[in-house]
Amino acid sequence: MNNRDKRVLVGMSGGIDSSATCIMLQEQGYEVVGVTMRTWDVPSRFSTPGQDEPDDVLEARALAERLGIEHHVADVRKEFKQIIVKHFIDEYMQGRTPNPCVLCNPLFKERILCEWADQTNCAHISTGHYCRLEERKGKLYIVAGDDQTKDQSYFLWKLPQEILQRFLFPLGTYTKQEVREYLRQKGFEAKARGGESMEICFIEGDYRNFLRSQCPDIDTQVGPGWFVNSKGVKIGQHKGFPYYTIGQRKGLEIALGHPAYVLRINAEKNTVMLGDAEELKAEYMLVEDYHITEMQDLLQCKDLSVRIRYRSKPIPCQVLVLDEKQLLVRFLSEASAIAPGQSAVFYEGKRVLGGAFIASQRGIRKIAADNQDKF
């Protein structure tokens, strides 16, 4: 093992998980190099007047100094806004429900980690994700972490093999509580007591307020529209389609005498379709832009399931290839609130076989009827 093979670049957020990752890798004999990505500025609790560095940079640097490791800061704010934040806004403006972490991890953060790893002569990269890697027939697969409440395999389905080959995931066999206890044992009591990070790093609070802050003319550009029922009949006014998501029940501000849910969003007509819980259910789902490690494994899997949003339970399913861009998914148990823009991630047990983005479900009944005998 040459010097490069012993070097690992860790994405350091200054939080619990990346801190534990650095310490564990050091104990395993690796020469750890840290990099903190400055993606989006949030109000700092620690910086002094005249110093504009955010908390994650300050905390990561302090940890690096204590561990005696090399530390860098990658200022990627401009690129992050142009790629990740723009995509987030664009998706909502098309009536879709994005998950920015799915795009950010493979197409942004891990790419930057690889670039910095090359610059710092590191063979490996690592993060504090709660997941593992497993090799099968010469291919690497993401495997869900042992802590089901913190498992982050859902976000990583788009990672290509060339990046997976460089990855180390030391937290995959730990629970969050075990990681906290590990830090205490190593003398990092304050770090062990740290809080959880925000689910979307660039949004504090309601995403609707964020949309307004980034698109000041959104309310005049879009304006109020109509709530309609499943027959297309207007039943009330809404504030504008970007402010609603599939499956939403709270905050609709409409009295129908019964619980109502968002069934569909039509950005072109600025309409939001409402219905009951039964109408929200689906037997089939159309997905697009898929990335599958081995298609035959997916099609022949006898224990295939799909997660249609983060933290949702896996749903048993079957998959049919429609063309090079689209798959048709048949659910084998109840599924509801199919939200275009979200990720559909396929599992065999805890192993990720691949994923895709949930497409518009317009015409799904005809597509399903034309193909139901092909499963």
From Swiss-Prot:
The record marks 129, 342 as: Interaction with tRNA. It catalyses: S-sulfanyl-L-cysteinyl-[protein] + uridine(34) in tRNA + AH2 + ATP = 2-thiouridine(34) in tRNA + L-cysteinyl-[protein] + A + AMP + diphosphate + H(+). GO terms for biological process: tRNA wobble position uridine thiolation. GO terms for molecular function: ATP binding; tRNA binding; tRNA-uridine 2-sulfurtransferase activity. GO terms for cellular component: cytoplasm. Residues 150-152, 309-310 are annotated as: Interaction with tRNA. ATP binds at residues 11-18, 37, 128. Coiled coil: none annotated. InterPro entries: MnmA-like, MnmA-like_C, MnmA-like_central, MnmA-like_central_sf, Rossmann-like_a/b/a_fold. The keyword tRNA-binding applies. The keyword ATP-binding applies. It is found in: Cytoplasm. Disulfide bonds join 104-201. Catalyzes the 2-thiolation of uridine at the wobble position (U34) of tRNA, leading to the formation of s(2)U34. HAMAP family: tRNA_thiouridyl_MnmA. This is tRNA-specific 2-thiouridylase MnmA 3. It comes from Phocaeicola vulgatus (strain ATCC 8482 / DSM 1447 / JCM 5826 / CCUG 4940 / NBRC 14291 / NCTC 11154). The gene is mnmA3.
